[in-house]
Amino acid sequence: MPCVVITGITGKSGQFLLKRLIAEKANLKDYQFILLCRPQNVKSKNPAGYQLLKDAMVCKELNIRIEEADLTCPKALDAFFQSCHADMLLHIASVKLSWNIVPEALKHGVDNLILVHTTGIYSKYKAAGEEYRQIEAKIHQLVAEYKEQGRRIAMTILRPTMIYGDLADKNISVFIRMVDKLRIFPTVNGARYDLQPVWCKDLGYAFYEVMTKWQVTRNKEYILSGGAPIQLREIFLEIAKQLGVKNTFISCPFWLACFGAWCIYLATLGKIDFREKVQRLVEPRAYGHEAAAKDFGYAPAPFAIGIREEIEMYKAEKR
C-alpha cells in the first residue's frame, strides 16, 4: 500500500485536493495518506481547511490520518519521517519550506517527490526568483548525491503561476478590493501585459492527477497556468463586470512609476522599497501548460469562470 505524505492540505488548493480524494475514495483503496499539519497550538489562517479535515476523517473508505509537525523545524520532521515509512511526499505548503522537508524525507527513504514550487523562479528580478533558484539548486544537488549512491529517486516539480480563488491569496484578492473601491484606477503602462493566473481548484485537481499517474508524470517539470493568457487590464475589467462597477483607468508611464518608487525608497531611508515590485508590474508572466495537458489532461478554467467564486466570497464578506 503506497503511503503518501501531503503538506499544505489546509490551504485553498490543498482543500480542493482533499475534496478530490474524498470523491475518488473508491479508486484509492490501495493508498494510505498522512496529512502533515501544523500543531494545534499554532493559529491557522485556514479554518475552513481544518473543518474540511474533520469532515474527511469521518470518511471511513479513505485511509487517511493527520499528523502534527512544524515544517520549520528539521528535528520535528526528522522524527516524523523516521516513524512513518512513507513512499511519496507531495509538498504543497511552500517552496520556501522545501529545503526543510526534502532532506529529511530523502534521509528516511522517501524516493518519490512531488514539489509544488512556482513560475516565480523564471523572474529576472533578484528578489522574486533568486531565492527559489537557490532552493531548487540545493535540492537537485542533494538528489544527485543520493542517486550516485544507487537510490532510484523520482522527483517532479510543479510550477503554478499566480494563484487565485481565496480572499487571502494576496494577488487577485487585492485587485478585487481595488477595483471595487477605486473609481479612478491608476495603472502602469495601461496594464497591457499578459498574465495567466490559475484557479486553486484546477491546481488541487492537477495535484491528484500527477500523484495517481506517477508512471507518466515522474521526473518531469510541469507549468500549471490558467486557461489562457489575459492582460491585467482585462482582469480588472472582468472583475468590475462581475462586481457591477465602472472604473476609469489612468495610465502612468513606467519611468514615472519607477521614479516614484525610488523617491519613496530614499525618503524612508530604504525602509519602504517598491522598486522591484514596480518592475515586476510590467514583467510578462504568461506561461503555457502544454506538457501538463498532454500527460494528464490538464484543462484549467478561463479566468472569467474561475474568478466567480472569489467574487461571491468578497460580496458575502461585505454584507
Regions found by a protein language model. Name each.
Residues 40-58:
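Glycine-rich phosphate-binding loop and adjoining beta1-alpha1-beta2 segment
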Residues 88, 99-156:
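Conserved Rossmann-fold NAD(P)-dependent oxidoreductase catalytic core, especially the SDR/UDP-sugar
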Residues 4-27:
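N-terminal Rossmann NAD(P)H-binding glycine-rich loop of SDR-like oxidoreductase domains
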Residues 177-198, 209-210, 216-218, 223:
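A conserved pocket-lining segment of Rossmann-fold NAD(P)-dependent short-chain dehydrogenase/reductase
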Residues 156-174, 193:
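Flexible, glycine-rich beta-alpha linker
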